[in-house]
């Protein structure tokens, strides 16, 4: 499989290199769908200029990236395009090997359950085969590298790509069972954009499975391992934050980065749900509604952990999607990361109810973003309501699509144990309904 992956990487790099050299690069780098106040390359350049002048990059209200990022590009500014292409390639490679290992685990678990006669007798068509799973890692790499969202994000030099790489390596190290490296990469991802802290739960659940430790409140081994992983994660995060302080000799980055993410002071339009509401809202209501909006990212973690404790990788997929929808400053690069996982769940396709309609909604909205932006900002024949309407439709489409995958996953799991052909007590055919 190395040759096909190498071919995909070559094609992806070629496409990016061609776009970097085209006149479109400048246009893409200014698109509000592709960059946000957090991830904009122009803001990174501004921060670097301030740093070169001996001024704190956080002294103004422009730069909101982490200190490690600004020091990374302080040395690699001349190779920025190459850095972003390598970043995308590393993300795809990490996802490739992560899913390759995950498929092996899935197949072994399926084989064991078949031997233990845990599946219903009429579900042979739901059983996954090695041939069916063989090309899934390559498809994942393909879905990530050649996704237009990923390409646009790379060409715009959005720092969202770096966050995607950190999350991809967190997934890889978690699936490999490396507790320490998993904690480090999760800490780096949290340090970068804060929201990946919610991935702690699925990461812990998967590592518990790898260690054959039951997820039981009364289990001593469960609490010991959870404490160890939490301490590794928190310790790594503290070390990274302290390193940032030593680089800048200042704590200014904490309110400038994390305060900015949580308080949402910059209402530049984007593909998220925050900007329009807070632009229209009275100032004295804003704190309450900021809390209401922010809690969405964290609120679903506990119920999902309870429902999907036996399926932590699917839980991780859902949680990444929730982050990309409900974070304060989302971009299409965030959407591209969870979309890369669609081939992993191709066995759910038969149970998806509205996938065609929802895919059309997402594609059409993606095409209408620049049209309605032009009508609003340049032509003056539309207003912010038009742009926010398409943004809202785009996010509703994503929410319904992820809900559809969640329903399909639960439905397949139920059929595996209860059989495909369900009957009611009176012998008539029954229908499975999610409540």
Swiss-Prot record:
Pathway: Glycolipid biosynthesis; glycosylphosphatidylinositol-anchor biosynthesis. One of its GO terms (molecular function) is GPI anchor binding. The chain crosses the membrane at residues 4-22, 79-99, 137-158, 159-178, 179-194, 195-205, 223-244, 287-306, 312-331, 332-345, 355-372, 385-406. Keywords: Endoplasmic reticulum, GPI-anchor biosynthesis, Membrane, Transmembrane, Transmembrane helix. A 2-acyl-6-[6-phosphoethanolamine-alpha-D-mannosyl-(1->2)-6-phosphoethanolamine-alpha-D-mannosyl-(1->6)-2-phosphoethanolamine-alpha-D-mannosyl-(1->4)-alpha-D-glucosaminyl]-1-(1-radyl,2-acyl-sn-glycero-3-phospho)-1D-myo-inositol binds at residues 383, 385. The keyword Endoplasmic reticulum applies. Its main location: endoplasmic reticulum. It is a multi-pass membrane protein. The keyword 4Fe-4S does not apply. Residues 23-78, 245-286, 373-384 are lumenal. Residues 1-3, 100-136, 206-222, 307-311, 346-354, 407-435 are cytoplasmic. One of its GO terms (biological process) is GPI anchored protein biosynthesis. InterPro entries: PIG-U. One of its GO terms (cellular component) is GPI-anchor transamidase complex. PANTHER family: GPI TRANSAMIDASE COMPONENT PIG-U (PTHR13121), PHOSPHATIDYLINOSITOL GLYCAN ANCHOR BIOSYNTHESIS CLASS U PROTEIN (PTHR13121:SF0). Component of the glycosylphosphatidylinositol-anchor (GPI-anchor) transamidase (GPI-T) complex that catalyzes the formation of the linkage between a proprotein and a GPI-anchor and participates in GPI anchored protein biosynthesis. Binds the lipid portion of GPI-anchor. May act as an organizer in the transmembrane layer to recruit other subunits, and thus is essential for assembly of the complex. Belongs to the PIGU family. Heteropentamer. Part of the GPI-anchor transamidase complex, consisting of PIGK, PIGT, PIGS, PIGU and GAA1. This is GPI-anchor transamidase component PIGU.
């Amino acid at each position: 499989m190395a040759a096909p992956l190498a071919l995909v990487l070559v094609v992806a790099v070629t496409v990016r290199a061609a776009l970097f050299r085209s006149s479109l690069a400048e246009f893409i780098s200014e698109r509000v769908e592709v960059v946000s106040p957090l991830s904009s390359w122009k803001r990174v350049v501004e921060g670097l200029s301030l740093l070169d002048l001996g001024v704190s990059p956080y002294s103004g209200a422009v730069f909101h990236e982490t200190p490690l990022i600004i020091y990374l590009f302080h040395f690699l500014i001349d190779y920025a395009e190459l850095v972003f292409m390598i970043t995308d390639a590393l993300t795809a490679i990490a996802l490739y090997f992560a899913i390759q290992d995950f498929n092996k685990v899935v197949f072994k678990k399926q084989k064991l359950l078949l031997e233990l006669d845990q599946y219903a007798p009429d579900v042979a068509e739901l059983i996954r085969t090695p041939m069916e799973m063989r090309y899934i890692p390559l498809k994942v790499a393909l879905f990530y590298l050649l996704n237009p969202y990923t390409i646009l994000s790379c060409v715009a030099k959005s720092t969202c790509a770096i966050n995607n790489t950190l999350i991809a390596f967190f997934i890889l190290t978690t699936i490999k069972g490396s507790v320490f490296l998993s904690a480090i990469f999760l800490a780096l991802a949290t340090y970068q954009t804060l929201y990946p802290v919610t991935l702690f739960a699925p990461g812990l659940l998967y590592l518990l499975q790898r260690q054959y430790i039951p997820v039981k409140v009364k289990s001593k081994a469960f609490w010991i391992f959870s404490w160890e992983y939490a301490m590794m994660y928190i310790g790594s995060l503290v070390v990274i934050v302290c390193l940032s302080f030593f680089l800048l000799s200042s704590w200014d980055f904490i309110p400038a980065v994390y305060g900015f993410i949580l308080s949402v002071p910059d209402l530049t339009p984007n593909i998220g749900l925050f900007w329009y509401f807070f632009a229209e809202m009275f100032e004295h209501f804003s704190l309450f509604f900021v809390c209401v909006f922010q809690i969405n990212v964290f609120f679903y973690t506990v119920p999902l952990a309870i429902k999907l404790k036996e399926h932590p990788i699917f839980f991780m997929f859902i949680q990444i999607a929730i982050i990309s929808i409900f974070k304060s400053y989302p971009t299409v690069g965030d959407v591209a990361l969870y979309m890369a996982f669609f081939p992993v769940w191709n066995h759910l396709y038969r149970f998806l109810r509205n996938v065609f309609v929802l895919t059309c909604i997402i594609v059409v909205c993606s095409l209408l973003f620049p049209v309605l932006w032009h009508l609003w900002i340049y032509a003056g024949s539309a207003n912010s309501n038009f742009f926010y309407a398409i943004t809202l439709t785009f996010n509703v489409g994503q929410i319904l699509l992820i809900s559809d995958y969640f329903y399909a996953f639960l439905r397949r799991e139920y059929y595996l144990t209860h059989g495909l052909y369900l009957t009611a007590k009176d012998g008539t055919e029954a229908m499975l309904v999610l409540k």
